[in-house]
Amino acid sequence: MKIQLIAVGTKMPVWVKNGFEEYQRRFPKDMPFELIEIAAGKLGKNADIKRILEQEGKAMLAAAGKAKIVSLDIPGKPWTTEQLATQLESWKSDGRDICLLIGGPEGLSTECKQAAEQSWSLSPLTLPHPLVRVIVAESLYRAWSLTTNHPYHRE
């Protein structure tokens, strides 16, 4: 199983890139974890937000292909580390690749939300989308460590 994090935004601060890559490199070879960045629409004073969201959404769904889509969205289901570990095992046994979608400053398009087979809420708080990349990478690595009895996760 391959895990893809499809995120809107291509020019992230160095700390985001470094934080994501720190966890990405820790994943085992049999569970590659990759980042696909989608260019963000141009937001300005007269920007057509609906059109921008639609364009970003189409690009995200095209990148996802036939993989199982999991959206990251506030109204989604919150998972504990243990529940995420169970999800990870379930996804592995399903045999499909997984695509996790992170929207940009305006969120996810309606099409992305509808295409998602699951929706995951990291927090009821609105989080900056660059930070979400790092949180998701760490959370997935922690969940993997729990499933393999790796000492990273401590209770």
Curated annotation (Swiss-Prot):
Q: Name one GO cellular component term.
A: cytoplasm
The record's keywords, sorted A to Z, are: Cytoplasm, Methyltransferase, rRNA processing, S-adenosyl-L-methionine, Transferase
Listed EC numbers: 2.1.1.177
**Disulphide bond pairs:** none
Catalyzed reactions per annotation: pseudouridine(1915) in 23S rRNA + S-adenosyl-L-methionine = N(3)-methylpseudouridine(1915) in 23S rRNA + S-adenosyl-L-homocysteine + H(+)
- The entry's S-adenosyl-L-methionine-binding residues are L72, G103, L122, S123, P124, L125, T126, L127
Pfam families hit by this protein: SPOUT_MTase
InterPro entries associated with the record: Alpha/beta_knot_MTases (IPR029028), RlmH-like (IPR003742), tRNA_m1G_MTases_N (IPR029026)
Database matches in Gene3D superfamilies:
3.40.1280.10
Q: Name the major location.
A: cytoplasm
Give GO MF terms, alphabetically: rRNA (pseudouridine-N3-)-methyltransferase activity
Q: Where in the cell is it found?
A: Cytoplasm
Under the heading HAMAP family, the entry gives: 23SrRNA_methyltr_H (MF_00658)
Give the family per the record. Answer: Belongs to the RNA methyltransferase RlmH family.
NCBIfam families linked to this entry: PRK00103.1-1, PRK00103.1-4, tRNA_RlmH_YbeA
Query: What does the annotation say about its assembly with partners?
Result: Homodimer.
Tell me, in a sentence or two, what this protein's role is. Specifically methylates the pseudouridine at position 1915 (m3Psi1915) in 23S rRNA.
Name of the protein described by the UniProt record: Ribosomal RNA large subunit methyltransferase H
Species name: Haemophilus ducreyi (strain 35000HP / ATCC 700724)
**What would be the name of the gene that encodes this protein?**
rlmH
